[in-house]
Amino acid sequence: MSKWKAKIFDISSIGIADVLSSGIASIFWLYIATTIGPEKYGEITYLLSIATLASGLSLLGSNYTLMIYSAKKIQIQSTLFLLTSIVGFVAALTVFFFFVDIGLSLIILGYIILALVTSDLLGRKLYKTYSKYVILQKILMVVFGIGFYYILKEPGILLGISLSYFPLIKELIKRFKENKIDFKLLVEKKNFIFNNFALNILGTAYSSLDKLIIAPLLGFVILGNYSLALQFFTLMSILPTVIQKYIIPQEATGNDNLKLKKIIILISVGIAVLGSTLGSIAISYIIPKFETSEEIIRVVSWAIIPVTINGVYYYPKFWAKEMNRHIVFSTTTTVSIQILGIVTLGSMFGIFGIAISLVIAISGGVCYSFIADKYLQKYS
């Protein structure tokens, strides 16, 4: 098999899984949004943001660490699985104490299991196995999520989603049998792991804090519209996300893929144009209850360009060189600008201010990555 054919085959394995899983998830959330309306959808999103925050902190950066070290055949899986599982259980119990919602607590554990297993599989370049689990989880999410909704109403959605993650436990058990627990590795790799932990905190803050701020600031109806727009943005992000998952392990083992990176960045420009024009019209036509989402999508679609530049060009380079502190600083820049933007621009311009702050924030993160990359080229 030629080099490019092999690349296309591997990318297709990841791509089919991510396209199908994102498509299934989007249909699921569109159905839920249409059924329960903007306010209830905003409330569900708010609770999921809490689960995202708790699981992100509990991961301790293990997902990024696993993807790199599994690719480099460093046997750290069992150690990270054990440590993360303990912290995850503590987080789940703490959240249950405050919210008394078993579904919410189980989702925290589910998020952790999914992140650990998929990161390890991608690092090992087991793309077919990755595809199988990702698609299976989304199918189960639809079956259980909708099924439990009609039994328990809104709380049933969270419980159903949480149950969809547990088939992945099989892979966790398999890794425990294959590798010995060795805490010395954590000490040896502490700087890289710590930077990944910091990155995980920032990534979690980026994906959840905006929703936790918007809810008390502008209400659950606005949050519901914003969350639906982000669901559409996630669909737009499928291609760069797939390529990033392919490139990171490749870059870690010395394959640059520069031509592929340039092609994907150019494609992202076309995606941004289509999202800003046709996408915004489509969402208001499909779900008229969420007409405010049209304005958000028109703006946030342009964020796909800086997301792609960072995701497929800069971040894989930083990870491969174990210079992930620059990803930490880039993400810090993004999170700081976005929070400031939501509080200031959101208060002044409402939904438009929130949307524009996202684009500015992600662009700010890319600016930092550009400067850091130039610095590394000059002094390395």
PLM-predicted stretches and their roles:
Residues 1-3, 7, 102-106, 124, ...:
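Interhelical loop/hinge segments that connect adjacent transmembrane helices in multipass membrane
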Residues 14, 41, 77-80, 104, ...:
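Alpha-helical transmembrane segments and their helix-entry boundary regions
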Residues 21-25, 29, 47-67, 104-122, ...:
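Short runs within selected transmembrane alpha-helices of multi-pass transporters and secretion channels
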Residues 27-53, 192, 196, 212-234, ...:
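Interfacial/gating helices of multi-pass transporter permease domains
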Residues 35-47, 72-84, 88-111, 150-158, ...:
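Membrane-interface helix-capping segments at transmembrane helix termini in multi-pass transporters
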Residues 35-38, 124, 151, 217-220, ...:
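Helix-loop interface residues and adjacent transmembrane-helix termini in multi-pass membrane transporters
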Residues 69-83, 188, 225-301, 305-315, ...:
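Specific pore-lining/lateral-gate transmembrane helices of multi-pass inner-membrane transport
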